[in-house]
Curated annotation (Swiss-Prot):
Expressed by the venom gland. Pfam families: Toxin_cobra-type. The keyword Cytoplasm does not apply. GO terms for molecular function: toxin activity. It is found in: Secreted. Its main location: secreted. Belongs to the three-finger toxin family. Ancestral subfamily. Orphan group II sub-subfamily. Gene3D superfamilies: CD59 (2.10.60.10). Keywords: Disulfide bond, Secreted, Toxin. Transmembrane segments: none annotated. Binds with low affinity to muscular (alpha-1-beta-1-delta-epsilon/CHRNA1-CHRNB1-CHRND-CHRNE) and very low affinity to neuronal (alpha-7/CHRNA7) nicotinic acetylcholine receptor (nAChR). One of its GO terms (cellular component) is extracellular region. This is Weak toxin CM-11.
Amino acid sequence: LTCLICPEKYCNKVHTCRNGENQCFKRFNERKLLGKRYTRGCAATCPEAKPREIVECCTTDRCNK
């Protein structure tokens, strides 16, 4: 599985996940409309969202756009 890993909205940096990491995730704060920063990467399980945070998980290559 390969996941995107950069914080910008439009991301092209790809990372190959390790064994056991079978999900890509994207995490961001729902309140910041301008200058939104994303946390992207690989995970074994979908990370839990903190208050006012959105976490999206998926299981195909580069799906965490």
